[in-house]
Curated annotation (Swiss-Prot):
InterPro entries: F-box-like_dom_sf, F-box_AtFBL13-like, F-box_dom, FBD, FBL13/AtMIF1-like, LRR_dom_sf, LRR_FXL15/At3g58940/PEG3-like. It holds the Pfam family LRR_At5g56370. It comes from Arabidopsis thaliana. LRR repeats lie at residues 132-153, 154-175, 180-201. Residues 8-60 form the F-box domain. PANTHER family: EMB|CAB62440.1-RELATED (PTHR31900:SF34), F-BOX/RNI SUPERFAMILY PROTEIN-RELATED (PTHR31900). This is Putative FBD-associated F-box protein At1g55030. It comes from the Eukaryota. Gene3D superfamilies: Ribonuclease Inhibitor. Residues 342-391 form the FBD domain.
Length: 422
């Protein structure tokens, strides 16, 4: 027996669940080729819980993918992922057949990335009536025409990335047919047939909406999600038409690169959240005047936005019950552009600093305005328990100076804060 045969024989003695785990760590096309090792190995790949095919990496014949799906014998197909560009060789009918076969294999998660530039794309009816599908990820350069009779009772997670719909009704048809949907992630493309994206899902708990820079400004949103706990809004001025009807359970909000929030109801709901993350530039974003975040205990502000230090005092004064403040800059030192301007400390110390318990600065770069902000906060807190600074962007020679400089501020007060530098 040669060395390859000996290794193959040793692997064959492993428990089948472990063999399937090993095969699952390989690209699907590679795992399938193990069937030539021996007669015993001809069936192992057919029990794999995950099948992934990517024509972007290598030319893919959908006929071969169909044969693989038809040969699959596992009682449940946990994941079926297909990335394909439709052309003369691979057409929409082939995609429809593959989806239909996957549904008969009790697929739990379907990931479909399709690029198609000619007209609408009609999915097989089986996609809209699958009882086992729990996660659906659609990355489509296509137009979806969704029928009114949709029922995906097990679907809990839905990604719609660069997906366009035939009209407003197609959106309503899809979402109304998902009675147990909990997570929805949307990334709108630059050309949209949908004027108002209606999200009326009573079960929805997490919603993320990203508008690209090319998203038409006439595109609006209507949100009615009474169970929603997390909301993320990202992108340009496209949120000018944004209507919130019911988000009474909202706890956490993340807002990134949004110029203005017009809807008064959303402003009201923002005042009831306990966690808020902002990546905004005050020079672009219109801060709502007179708003008080009475329930806010956790605030995160991104420090790589222009004039971010002007937003900070506004939020501190508006958040009287704040307990945790996190400032974050996830850009590396090579991409850092020092903003012009200076920190003007508030005339009156914000009430929240008197009972702030935790101060985190991730990506502290020891810039002038950062030093002023850090010292102001450390100096004016008297209940601060922990201060955590990430100094990865600072040279090892300067770190000791930075540490001593920050600690000296607290030593001059009655604060018994514990420092952590990482």
């Amino acid at each position: 027996m040669n060395n390859r045969g000996a290794v193959t024989d040793m692997i064959s003695q492993l428990p089948e669940p472990l063999i399937l785990q090993i095969l699952g760590s390989l690209p699907t096309k590679v795992a399938i080729t193990t069937s030539v090792l021996s007669k015993q190995w001809q069936s192992h790949w057919k029990m794999m819980p995950k099948l992934e095919f990517d024509s972007f990496l290598r030319r893919l014949d959908l006929e071969n993918v169909t044969k693989c799906l038809l040969s699959h014998k596992a009682p449940v197909l946990q994941t079926f992922s297909l990335k394909v560009r439709l052309d003369r060789r691979n057409n929409a009918v082939d995609i429809g057949c593959l989806i239909g076969i996957a549904m008969t294999r009790n697929v739990r998660k379907l990931v479909l990335e399709v690029y198609f530039h000619r007209g609408t794309f009609t999915f097989p009816r089986s996609l809209y009536h699958c009882e086992t599908l729990e996660t659906l990820e659609l990355i489509l350069n296509v137009v979806m025409d969704v029928p009114p009779s949709v029922y995906l009772k097990s679907l809990k997670t839905l990604y719609l990335l660069a997906v366009d719909f035939k009209d407003d009704e197609s959106v309503i048809n899809l979402l109304s047919g998902c009675p147990n949907l909990q997570d929805l992630v949307m990334r709108r493309n630059s050309s949209s047939n949908v004027k108002t994206f209606t999200i009326a899902v009573p079960s929805l708990q997490r919603l993320a909406i990203h508008n690209g820079s090319g998203t038409p400004q006439h595109c609006g949103y209507t949100i009615n999600t009474p169970s929603l706990k997390y909301l993320k809004l990202e992108g340009s001025k496209a949120f000018e038409s944004f209507m919130v009807e019911n988000v009474s359970e909202l706890i956490e909000v993340n807002i990134t690169d949004v110029s203005e929030i017009i809807d008064e109801k959303l402003r009201v709901f923002l005042t009831s959240v306990t966690r808020l993350s902002l990546a905004l530039s005050p020079s672009v974003f219109t801060f709502p005047t007179g708003i008080i975040f009475n329930q806010l205990v956790y605030l995160e502000i991104c420090t790589n936005k222009t004039s971010w230090w002007k937003l900070l005092p506004l939020m501190l004064h508006s958040s009287p019950k704040l307990q945790v403040l996190k400032l974050i800059d996830d850009t590396d030192g090579m991409n850092y552009v020092e903003a012009s301007g200076e920190w003007n400390q508030p005339k009156n110390v914000p009430e929240c600093l008197h009972h702030l318990e935790k101060f985190i600065w991730e990506g502290y770069k020891w810039k002038r305005e950062e030093i002023e902000v850090a010292k102001y906060i450390l100096k004016n807190t008297n209940r601060l328990k922990r201060a955590i600074f990430s100094l990865k962007g600072i040279s090892s020679e300067d770190r000791l100076v930075v540490v001593e400089d920050l600690k000296s501020v607290v030593m001059a007060t009655t604060n018994s804060c514990q420092f952590q530098f990482i």
